[in-house]
Structures are given as C-alpha cells and as structure tokens.
Amino acid sequence: MSSDGERDMARKPIRRALISVYDKTGLIDLAQGLNAAGVDIVSTGSTAKAIADQGIAVTPVEELTGFPEVLDGRVKTLHPRVHAGLLADLRKPEHAAALEQLGIEAFELVVVNLYPFSQTVKSGATVDECVEQIDIGGSSMVRAAAKNHPSVAVVTDPLGYVGVLAAVQGGGFTLAERKMLASMAFQHIAEYEIAVASWMQSTLAPEQPPTAFPQWFGRSWRRSAILRYGENPHQQAALYSDPSACPGLAQAEQLHGKNMSYNNFTDADAAWRAAFDHEQSCVAIIKHANPCGIAISSLSVADAHRKAHECDPLSAYGGVIAANTEVSLEMAEYVSTIFTEVIVAPSYAPGAVDVLSCKKNVRVLVASAPLRGGSELRPVSGGLLIQQPDQLDTAGDNPANWTLATGSPAGPATLTDLVFAWRACRAVKSNAIVIAADGATIGVGMGQVNRVDAARLAVERGGDRVRGAVVASDAFFPFADGLQTLAAAGVTAIVHPGGSVRDAEVTAAATKAGVTLYLTGVRHFVH
C-alpha cells in the first residue's frame, strides 16, 4: 500500500464531540454510547438539556465559550473557542501550538443537523417563521468540520449514528471515511442552501416584472437507483429524484417485477401523462414514447384497455400500460395474457396484483397522479432548455372555442370523439395524426417529417376502421394533400390548429370532400 493509502486508512481516535441537533432521533443512544466510550460531549441548548436529562455527562457550550446564548438562540456557537476547535488542522504544528496557547481543545467529531427550513416552508408558515428556520450556526459548524476533515469527522444524518459508535469502538474514523463524511456534509449543506436561495428569490425578491424563468435557479438531485444500462446496453444510466419536488413517477412504488430500466421509465412517464390527459377512465399503451393505443370508456377501465389494445395489438406487445384509475381484476386478467413490460396505475383492485404477478417479469407500479404545473427540463450541449409543460389547458383546447371552418357542425358523438382525438394527439410525437372512433385511437401516424406521410401511416394502421372516423392533427396542414389522404379514406371530421398560409386551400379540400373541419388556434408539437 502507498503512503497515501496508509494515511487514508489510519484511524483517528475520538476523544471530544460537539453535538447540536434539531432532530433528536437517536440522540440519547448516541450520547450514551459516546459517554460509555469516554468521549467528552459538548452540546448546545435543547440538545444539551435532552442529554443531561438522561443523566449523561455533557458540557453546555456556554461553559466552553464563557458567553451566554443570545438573540433568541441565534447566537450560540459562533465563537472562536468553538470554531478554532473545529478548524485547527492538527497536521500543522503551528495550529496545535495556537490551540495550546489559547487553551482551546480540538474536536474530533461533530454531529449536527439543521433547522427544518424546507418543511417549515411547505407547512405554509409566515415569512418571519420561515426566516427563523434558516440555520446559521449549524451550517457554520458543518462547513468548518467538513473543511477540516483531516482532523474532524462530521455527521449530519441520524442514520449515521450507528456508524459513529462503531467507529468510536474501533479506534475512530479513517481519513478515507472522514473524506466521505465531509463530502456528504457539503452535499447536505448545498441542498439546504439551494432551498433557502430558491425561497428567497421567489418569495422575498421576485423579479419584476414577474417571470416564470428567473435569472438563477437551483435544484438538488439524489440518486435513487443505478439502472442496468441506458437506452442501449453500452450506455450507463441512473435515476435521480428531486427531494424538494412533489412525488411523481420517480417515487412510484414497485409492487412486482424486475428492476425498472431507463427505457421503462421514459415509456412509463409518457404513458402516465397520456392517461391523465383525459377525465374519463383512460388507458394508454406506449412503446418508444409513442402510443400504440389510447382509449377512454364510460363503462370500465377494462373496456378502455381493450379498446386501446385493439388499436395496434402488434405494437402493444412488450409495451407499457398506464391507467388513470384503479386497475380492475377484469383488466388485470386481460393484461396477464399479453407480454407487458410495465403497468402503472394509482391503485389496484383486490386480487389484481396477484393476477399480474403470475408474470414474473412485468413491473407493477403504483404512482400518484401527475401534478399540473412545474417545468420541463431538457439538456442541450452547454446548456439547459426549460419550458412550461403542455397541459391541454389553453382556450383552444376547449371545443366551445373551436372555429367551424367548413361542413356541418359535429353532433354530440362526433364532437366527443374529436375532443378525445385532440387530447390524445398531445401524447404523439410530431408530426402527429390521430384517427379515432368511439373514444379510442384506431390509427396513429407519429414522428414523421412531413404531415402527409403521418396521414398515410395513420390510414394504413387504421385500415377499414377509418371510414366514418374522426381525425386530430397536432399542427396545421401545410398543404391540402394530408387532408385529402384522410378524406379519401373516409373520415368525416377533422380538427387541426389552422394558421397555415394555405389554410384556404385546405378548407376548400375539406369542403369538396364533404368533411367537417374545425380550427383550434393552438398546436401541440412533441419532440
């Protein structure tokens, strides 16, 4: 072993500890263990009281500093007799000599956790109450100890207390372990400071005029899982979650099946969002982030699944299924006959998971309904794109605001199918054409680089079912050829955004074919 490796593995005995915690979980067991091992404990405020109340020897920090706690506890540990003991690098003889000259003892261990700032904000507390939960002394002690990791070990999580006691019994932490603890401590501080800075920016100093895109924004991410690989086996991948965000698919509970893959997550996310684009019971079947089928039903979720599957049974093989309502036993029995990678729903009826679990590999997830709002992030080389999610909530998404360009007004059943097709189209990669009937997609043309090819693909997939169906297009028809392709296949009504310089030609083609044509004034590209 090299000399550097030997230094990393050498243990530094723990003789003196500084403890100051808001979260008292595990505190007494820790203090008892340290006391039994002969470690001197210095502590603050309520932490010192909790330790002393158990008959455990503890030195209040004010005895160390000779200065009382002041300003409602805002100043307790911000004192040279504390921070010199934290920051003295005992590898340097001059630091050790300075401590001896000043009569200051060094600490080998710091145990600190911070005021619950984020929890206070989420509770709806007042601005002043939130400000009081911005930790100053605790953050300073953690940063000082982490900086001085050659001499001090720092622990910020009660889950680490077992390791502390094991290290004390084993002769102390190694330098390698102290480096790891220091890294974890700075991660903890960074996450905390990002939360404070974000709140300050949005609450105390919002930009004027107000904007959804501030000059600065910060987020912290925690690794939730290392995945088998990325989109392809030669790519490494992992899942990270935002601890400050509301629960989403990344926090889904897996009830059965193999570990989720990268592609499972991307497809499940697309399916989950597509299913919740609709108010009725809806099932979306997704593969490669595109719909194999989407359907709604007023009868049952099983009926919605049956209709979604019938759209494209061949492509649905090995797909990902999402339902926006509880999966019934009937639906589970149908799904169990089909090779399925993932099924995700808000809940499952009694017995449904047992039926699905007969297939050992299918991943069965429970996830909360996706929350509206937030931001979508997409990395680009050297930067990051941010946009508001496309949520089908514009005026143009309401059929009451559609413009009838030509043809007879759609009857109730036809209009219902047009609305369904329009909402389903949001989930399809552009250029997108969705042909629908009876609350179900029957032909989907997706991801084409021109709209007429998307129309041809949708017609080909729909086959004989296209006659009498309706169509939604995610963007305008730039030429009449796409609409003519659909009209020749027998569709009766089409909805599209409009806005092309050739809108008049497209409308004339619809009039000639006897097709009802609506304009929404809003598009729904997906890239």
From Swiss-Prot:
Gene: purH
SUPFAM superfamilies noted in UniProt: Cytidine deaminase-like, Methylglyoxal synthase-like
Signal peptide: none
Disulfide bonds: none
Native source species: Mycobacterium leprae (strain TN)
Domain MGS-like, residue spans: 9-156
Family, similarity comment: Belongs to the PurH family.
NCBIfam families in UniProt: PRK00881.1, purH
Keyword flag Hydrolase: yes
CDD domains listed in its UniProt record: IMPCH
Keywords: Hydrolase, Multifunctional enzyme, Purine biosynthesis, Transferase
Cross-referenced SMART domains: AICARFT_IMPCHas, MGS
GO CC aspect terms: cytosol
Protein name, as recorded: Bifunctional purine biosynthesis protein PurH
Biological processes annotated in GO: 'de novo' IMP biosynthetic process
Transferase keyword on record: yes
PROSITE patterns: MGS
